[in-house]
Amino acid sequence: MKTVYEYYTHRVAFEGTVDECWKWIMDQAFTMDDGRKIFRTWEENGEMVYDVGNVYIFNK
């Protein structure tokens, strides 16, 4: 079974169940002190930018 999720502007077909997909997504995130998850970081003009964003899972 493939699980499709949208990550920013990309759709990804994940090889596994919805629960396996969600666990994989959560494992990739960094947890901040207040409990929020950070999914993407990058550097602009010497400063780190953090994008929490949203993840949508379509077939649950």
Provide a role label for each language-model segment.
Residues 11, 20-21, 56-57:
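Short, surface-exposed beta-strand-loop junctions and turns on beta-sheet-rich folds
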Residues 1-10:
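Short aromatic-glycine-(Arg/Gly/Cys) micro-motifs in beta-strand/loop hairpins
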